[in-house]
Amino acid sequence: MTFLLSRTFISLTLRPSCSISMANLTTNAKTRLRGVVFDMDGTLTVPVIDFAAMYRAVLGEDAYKRIKAESPSGIDILHHIESWSPDKQQKAYEIIADYEKQGIDKLQIMPGTAELCGFLDSKKIKRGLITRNVQKAIDIFHQRFEVIFSPALGREFRPYKPNPDPLLHICSTWDIQPNEVMMVGDSLKDDIACGKRAGAFTCLLDETGRYGPDDFSVSGLQPDFKVDSLSKIQNLLETNFDLNP
């Protein structure tokens, strides 16, 4: 499947300081892109964590079914845990840590990641990382992949995705405006929401065709681009953006 340029690419709702002039759009001028920020689990790494099983273990079967029915776009387990008592939180985080450790033990780099990073390096485009996983997982990812993403923020950075603050922090660190950055991830409710709220371009990685128009309509979140493989992103960037340093 080739990349999808969404209708919102032309009518992006950005903060005033991040707006794109209609004059540029009508003359087909390409917008400058200076940085790409990636999600980690399911984007840079092959998805291996059984999130449904983890949610059941943390919430209990009845609560899991109820919350899932109330949240068709997905369960934000970290958000639910925040309101619990300290003892209950600790037990929940221990369960999550166990599942995440299993994921770390099975960590595999997503096909196309090395090639995409090489392309970004050749264009001097910065790359960062935002994950709701822990910093230890980021460190192991860096060790195994031997390519560094910087800044690389785990859930220790508060507030975490889908809040835009992690992405805005990276933009500030780079001294780059959000509308010169793209957020790439496999989660509509976390990655695309984070990017949209920050005023960045967004690209949804959807390998299995999980997301469709109904999901975008219900969530109110439409990515600017959608790809089924990281290998499609290089062509997407070259076609739609000015990549000159």
Curated annotation (Swiss-Prot):
Active site residues per record: 39 (nucleophile), 41 (proton donor)
Protein's UniProt name: Haloacid dehalogenase-like hydrolase domain-containing protein At2g33255
SUPFAM superfamilies: HAD-like
InterPro entries: HAD-like_sf (IPR036412), HAD-SF_hydro_IA (IPR006439), HAD_sf (IPR023214)
Organism per entry: Arabidopsis thaliana (Mouse-ear cress)
Gene3D superfamilies noted in UniProt: 1.10.260.80, HAD superfamily/HAD-like
Binding site residues for Mg(2+): 39, 41, 186
EC number(s) from the headed UniProt entry: 3.1.3.-
Homology family: Belongs to the HAD-like hydrolase superfamily. DOG/GPP family.
Any GO molecular function: hydrolase activity
Pfam family, one: Hydrolase
GO cellular component term, pick one: chloroplast
Cofactor(s) it depends on: Mg(2+)
Alphabetic keyword roster: Acetylation, Hydrolase, Magnesium, Metal-binding
